[in-house]
Amino acid sequence: MVRQLIPAMLLPDRLYVMVGRGGNGAAASGAGTAGPRSYVSIMANQTAAAYLISISGAADAAAGVAGTATTNAGGAAGTIATATAAYGHGLGLWVAVAGQAGGAGGAGTGGAGTAITWGGSGVPISGGAGGGGTPTANTDNAGGAITGAGLFPTISGGAAAAGAGNHGVKLQRNPLWATCGGSGGGTAGAAGTAGRGGDASYGSGGGGGGGGVTGGAGGRGGDGLVIIAAW
């Protein structure tokens, strides 16, 4: 996430904005698709630092991690843009902040997906929560939730026995603008397909799919968002 304040006299009359689309969640046991960064440029189709007013991160958003019988890592946080990544970072006040990592899936020995606390990384967005894990005994577990804080509500995880994770939401009210990621899907241990992870809202991460004989698909990552205001 990047925030900038630039005197208008230092900017051209026309800017070109490319907003990154969220990466797709993968099917069972597969890795998701990485989401590209967002750019503000002084020339169309140019992303080199000498053309850029702003760039959202040092690298494209990491793809969601593929689940296995033993691993359950969450997706990595969005990277911090560097001062040299865009010449426009030196035109005014500039702050870059890392995103929030996704929650881990439930353990291979069985367990609920890891919940994500909204606002826990100091940004008004969130990673996606982890999907539930199921053991060889086929016990079902719920997906992780997005735990609300302040004015932001809790988004519950998918119920045990193949419940789908809930989609992330966007709040736009005075005095709050915020989004969150999707919650995790519940497991389907003995048969069937586990719950799908919830899709994310702007700038946030998709929820992890639940584990099972056939794991649930991961949720889609949120699209980027560029807001430009002048006064």
Predicted regions and their residues:
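C-terminal, surface-exposed recognition/capping segments
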Residues: 191-219
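A C-terminal functional module that forms or caps the active site or interfaces directly
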Residues: 127, 180-190
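Composition-driven low-complexity repeats that form or flank extended alpha-helical/coiled-coil segments
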Residues: 154-157
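Membrane-topology and secretion signals of cell-surface/extracellular proteins
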Residues: 164-166, 186-195
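Short, structured beta-strand segments at or near domain termini in extracellular proteins/domains
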Residues: 220-231
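Secretome/extracellular-domain signature
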Residues: 1-152
